[in-house]
């Protein structure tokens, strides 16, 4: 399912099987309800508008969303936002498959910002489970992630200030430039670093 502009899913049931991307809104993709199931060879949910900073986002507000992808589960050129619903993502064959030698198989990927502020999100990713080229904030909701690489990765800054975050499998569980944990519950399992920051780490509460 593809739109050259904005793509909205408000209700109903969608079962999509695609050799490439599952649902793609060029300008934006919003799921605000319904039951959405995607099995794709490429990215499951995608928005790739690259010439407007207010576009290129993927937003899940509500609904039941189940994604199985050969590529990324969610791929947003700007922001990826989850504020509600039940989201289940398996990308790249899952954590047991390991990081692919080519291509990207991340659970949630965004170039600017990732926000999780509600809902229940479960990710089983061959690559990073949650990956932002910019910053991310996990404010509320429940996130459970298994990864063949990093559990939660950000190039700039990560703020965990209320969500319940559990990384069950990873090489590095939480990696970023600046990392702040100020609230919530954070439980990390890794084969390498639990928390790795190239800048500073601030822990005020929440680390299990």
Regions found by a protein language model. Give the residues of each.
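Acidic/polar low-complexity surface segments
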Residues: 2-14, 20-207
């Amino acid at each position: 399912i593809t739109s050259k502009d904005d793509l909205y899913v408000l209700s109903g049931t969608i079962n999509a099987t695609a050799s490439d991307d599952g649902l793609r809104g060029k300008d934006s993709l919003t799921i605000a309800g319904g039951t959405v199931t995607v099995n794709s060879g490429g990215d499951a949910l995608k928005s790739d508008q690259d010439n407007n900073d207010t576009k290129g986002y993927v937003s899940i507000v509500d609904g039941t969303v189940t994604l199985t992808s050969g590529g990324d589960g969610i791929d947003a050129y700007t922001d990826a936002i989850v504020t509600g619903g039940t989201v289940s993502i398996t990308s790249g064959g899952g954590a047991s498959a390991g990081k692919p030698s080519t291509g990207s198989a991340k659970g949630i990927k965004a170039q600017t910002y990732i926000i999780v502020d509600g809902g229940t999100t479960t990710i089983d990713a061959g690559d990073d489970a949650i990956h932002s080229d910019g910053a991310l904030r996990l404010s509320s909701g429940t996130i459970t992630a298994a990864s063949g690489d990093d559990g939660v990765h950000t190039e700039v800054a990560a703020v965990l200030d209320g969500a319940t975050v559990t990384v069950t499998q990873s090489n590095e569980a939480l990696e970023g430039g600046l990392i702040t944990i100020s609230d919530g519950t954070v439980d990390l399992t890794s084969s390498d670093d639990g928390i790795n920051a190239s800048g500073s780490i601030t822990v005020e509460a929440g680390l299990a």
